[in-house]
Amino acid sequence: MPSKFEFNKGKMVPYPSGAIVPDRDLGERPALECIHLGIEFGGLKAVDDFSLTIGKTEIAGLIGPNGAGKTTVFNLLTKVYQPTHGTILLDGEDTSGKSVYQVNRMGIARTFQNIRLFNTMTVEDNVKVGLHNQERYSGFEGVLRLPTYWKHEKAAHERAMELLSIFDMEHLANEQAGSLPYGAQRRLEIVRALSTNPKLLLLDEPAAGMNPSETAELMANIVKIRDTFGIAIMLIEHDMSLVMNICEGICVLNFGKVIAKGTAEEIQNNDAVIEAYLGKQDKGEN
């Protein structure tokens, strides 16, 4: 068995060494704590006894075979689903009973496996949608276009352009979101999530559909986001090269249960992980 591998269409292939993540102080209080989290659908345990801690500036990976429960975990964290049992702490604050909107205000933002932009709106307006959870004017002031409204709109424009410039997208501000190339749409969705000022950013298969060049750019951008904004990032991804290169901690799910946690090297050499992806091999097999 090779000491390092990535999973690629059911085969173990050599994985190049040289991860790009530096040693980091992950902070005293975790950004996220999941404690015995679970949810059942009609008696089926989609996620069972899920516990995980993510440091304040950690890039963490959540991996597993298709149907393992990864996106369900994201839906629990963002309150699309309310857990059947367990606790979620964001920066030490219990999110129990909170709505999708409330946990976003608390500091959890996400992107989706399938891009969900407002295609007929401009790039800038897509980003400003995320800024509206920070509105400081009333509906009355907005309807009458009072000075408070214009002050906020000016600040929102400046913030949107600042965020777009970080990803070299400011020149696209007036373009329709739906007209952008695929990779740029992915970046825009991440920028919009960042506009909500999150403490934890959840990325659901951010490299899906990307070519190798776009994936390499994405990897650099994820590290850039962590270093620029000082936030925690948790990602679901099937591109194991991406995961193994940038994630400090990796959690592996199978059939809704955690089967392994650890560093890239530990996960790559974990028998339970290999079996989950590739199936159990008889001792006599080569």
What kind of region is each of these model predictions?
Residues P2-N286:
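Glycine-rich phosphate-binding loops of nucleotide-dependent enzymes
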